[in-house]
Amino acid sequence: METRPAERVFSNGDVYSGQLKGTLPHGKGKYAWPDGIIYEGDWEEGKISGRGKLMWSSGAKYEGDFSGGYLHGFGTLTSPDGSVYAGAWRMNVRHGLGRKEYCNSDVYDGSWREGLQDGSGSYSWYNGNRFIGNWKKGKMSGRGVMSWANGDLFNGFWLNGLRHGSGVYKYADGGFYFGTWSRGLKDGSGVFYPAGSKHPSLKKWHRHFGYDDTGNFLLSHNSTINIDDLRTSKAVSRSLSELTTTSGLTRTSERYPDDYWSTSDPPRDFMHHGPSSKSARSVDSGQSEIRDKNPIVFEREYMQGVLIKERIMSSIDMSHRARPLNLTKEVTVSACVSFLGGKWNHYLMLNLQLGIRYTVGKITPVPPREVRASDFSERARIMMFFPRNGSQYTPPHKSIDFDWKDYCPMVFRNLREMFKLDAADYMMSICGDDGLREISSPGKSGSIFYLSHDDRFVIKTLKRSELKVLLRMLPRYYEHVGDYENTLITKFFGVHRIKLKWGKKVRFVVMGNMFCTELKIHRRYDLKGSTQGRYTEKNKIGEKTTLKDLDLAYEFHMDKLLREALFKQIILDCSFLESLQILDYSLLLGLHFRAPDPLTDILEPPNEMSDQESDSVGSVDVNLPREPSIPPKGLLMVTHEPNSVNTAPGPHIRGSTLRAFSVGEKEVDLILPGTARLRVQLGVNMPAQAHHKLGQDNEESGTVELFEVYDVVVYMGIIDILQEYNMKKKVEHTCKSMKYDPMTISAIEPTLYSKRFIDFLLKVFPEKA
């Protein structure tokens, strides 16, 4: 049907002048609504489609592409306040590459998703500050570089608009701080290099974050957006199947209300980011004035922005010692070398995921029932061959051919259900697209460790002897875990074996991660109660190092009832292990140090933006006083309220909420000011006071402990429970007893091991005086 020019006036006051196809606008035309909104441009069978210009009575204006009645393609929106967005749109929302100039002269240049900054982008503040890096849902998240107008620069990781993870802070005077941050504050170990001292190479950091070795920013391809260039890109298309009538032109879904330009702006929840505070600069950059031939450097430990420990060293000493931190990666990931190496280790990971997905999918439809004796037998196995090209029962995959064996599947299904683990969630955690992360082994076993992407599960390779012990103890283990919901013993959720094409067999066990928490674990200890060889060399201690018995410089004071519940369960668990002739187990202890709440108002940024600010990202300088010498309370126990708890328990927790003597023997929650409200359970979220043992630090080491008492949140569990007191251990005991005191070595008779273990922990967690 041919188009013809016409002019139509509708009963509601709308006016259209232009080409029609039948009764529908088609071709070029102009449409005016009674409230002053005007569209002029292309139409397609009654829909605004093609190129056009849309003007609001408020003064807002859009010029660019439309599709099916929506802003869709590339175009420029000018708001009444003077802000201008030029870039990609999808269904009335900024989506794709675009540049926004805010009314206060801030500029964002980069990727958008669903109306918010998301992906790579550059944000320049009117005061000269600038950020280049990754964004997520409108906030700085991932890798990025922030430079301040005063010359300071931070190069590292971000989360929700805050410095979070490893990074390097460069001061304007030339000093550097290499360390870790948590929610915008220094948190954990780090090293400060005053100006003039020799520091680690920054080239890798510079290349990772998009600026050259001199520190000059290198703009990415999207630093300047040209609409003509963008129009050559393939626009996002969407099926528009809705039929439109002439009266349909007046519907609100197609008219773009007068306040559209404001409602589509990003939310006003950005954070301010100033350079390092004056208190921090007085500690760090003030020392950068040291410029002798052998300047000192400072090893430091922070607790939510509060400096708690410092060790003074020379830069020469630092250059000859192992790096204490792995700063070129996110803090959560650390690689280790396996016997398979490279791609074979990757294949092993893929095989593990394929096998677990197959096993869980096969066992889940089986009707629930109690376990039987036959479920523990040698015949209780699921076996399957996984050829690369797939089979009648298995999908094709990109790994190598392998044989899969799953041990006692019904037993482990019931164990997972005992801990309320949904089968679908379990598979998604381990077998999801995000995959597994390999983590460094904390011990001497040579095992490979994997961590699920959500940190809920740890997967460890087993020796053949360990597998045999686990299968022998499994009936008793199942009974013990069922009888004692508060048990601290490692939670096992699956045991598997992979046989590779050249005959190599690799055995795995899936366990709950005892440190599955949003809180940062500042210290980790592996405590056995023995002393022979139970220390870590100072130059090998890093951010993620698991320390040992002789490294423990604290004793922990707990609420009376919490302590009673703890040792009641420890004694029960040790009796169970003793009855199985198990030794070499240890208490894995994780500590989260709390900075006192009153300090949060006088520490480093962040500071929230005031309501008067625009939707641009704020940037202010914060003047902070120096750190106080005595920290007030950093946590608080209150009566348990189930609906008020912020976080769900990890997969290793099944027990009830604990009662505290100090709260009237009621069930309790733990409040961490400004962070969370947590349910207190045995081994999880347990509050305590860590008392530093005087004289523990060697004066010659130059280490200064700034406080004597800290509030801590404690996480713990009993691990490494698969070593029997066999002939090999008896021989080890005999040989070492000739050289050392028999009670100081690890390999002793299980009854003595259990008693020594408990006695040692009674000293670590003493009764309050």
Curated annotation (Swiss-Prot):
Protein name (database record): Phosphatidylinositol 4-phosphate 5-kinase 8
MORN repeat windows: 16-38, 39-61, 62-84, 85-107, 108-130, 131-153, 154-176, 177-198
The EC number(s) this enzyme carries: 2.7.1.68
One GO MF term: ATP binding
Organism lineage string: Eukaryota, Viridiplantae, Streptophyta, Embryophyta, Tracheophyta
Reactions catalysed, as given in the entry: a 1,2-diacyl-sn-glycero-3-phospho-(1D-myo-inositol 4-phosphate) + ATP = a 1,2-diacyl-sn-glycero-3-phospho-(1D-myo-inositol-4,5-bisphosphate) + ADP + H(+)
Ranges of residues in domain PIPK: 344-765
InterPro entries found in the cross-reference section: MORN, PIno-4-P-5_kinase_pln, PInositol-4-P-4/5-kinase_C_sf, PInositol-4-P-4/5-kinase_core, PInositol-4-P-5-kinase_N, PInositol-4/5-P-5/4-kinase
Region annotation (Disordered) ranges: 266-289
Gene Ontology BP, a term: phosphatidylinositol metabolic process
GO cellular component: membrane
Tree of life domain: Eukaryota
Gene this chain is encoded by: PIP5K8
Residue ranges, compositional bias (Polar residues): 276-288
Stretches the record annotates as Activation loop: 725-746
Keywords for this protein: ATP-binding, Kinase, Nucleotide-binding, Repeat, Transferase
